[in-house]
C-alpha cells in the first residue's frame, strides 16, 4: 500500500489467490499492479512466473523478499522435521530462488536498484524455541552481506531488515491458529505494526543511489535483550 500510494508499479506474489487478487483490486486505482499466485518454495513455478513477466513489469528497481515463517516454539528434541523442512524451504530456498532469478533484471537497472531481505532479530539473538527459524534468519543475514560483496560495482544495493516484535499473522501461523497464544504475545506491548515495516522498506529503497543500508535492526520500545537465561544450582 505504501509503494502503491507513491505510484510504484508492483508485482505482488502469494499463495492465497483470493486474498492476493483482493489486494490487487484495492491498489489498482493508484498504480499498475500484477498479482502472481505462486509459492516461492516451488523453483519451477518461480522460474516460469518470472520468465513470463509482461514487458511493462520487466524493468525491476526493487525486490522485497518477505516470505517467511516460524512453526512452533517447542525445544529442538520435540520438534517436527516436517516443520523444520518447511522453514528451510520458505525462509532460505524461497529467498534464494527469487533473488537469483531476478538478479539479472536488478543489475540491468543498475544504480538505485535494491534488494530488501526480511531477516529477524532471531538471526542475531538466540532464544529458546528459535532453533531452525533463528538459524534460517542468520543465513539470510550472512547471505545479504555476501551478496553485497558480489554486487559491488553493479549499483544494486542489498539490505537485511531485522524486525523484532511485530503484530502480524506471523504468530498466528507459529501457534497453528491458536488465537489465545497469539493474543498473549502482544498483550500489554505496543508492538511494531506491518505498516511500520512497510514505511521502513520504502525509506530504504528511496535512499540516494550512492547509499546502502547494510542492515537495520528494528524493535518496539517495549522490547529489549534482557531475557538471558541463567541455570542456577
Stretch-by-stretch model annotation:
Residues 99, 136:
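Active-site helix of classical SDR
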Residues 17-18, 37-49, 81:
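The beta1-alpha1 cofactor-binding region of Rossmann-like NAD(H)/NADP(H)-dependent oxidoreductases
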Residues 74-76, 80-88:
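Substrate-binding pocket helix/loop in short-chain dehydrogenase/reductase
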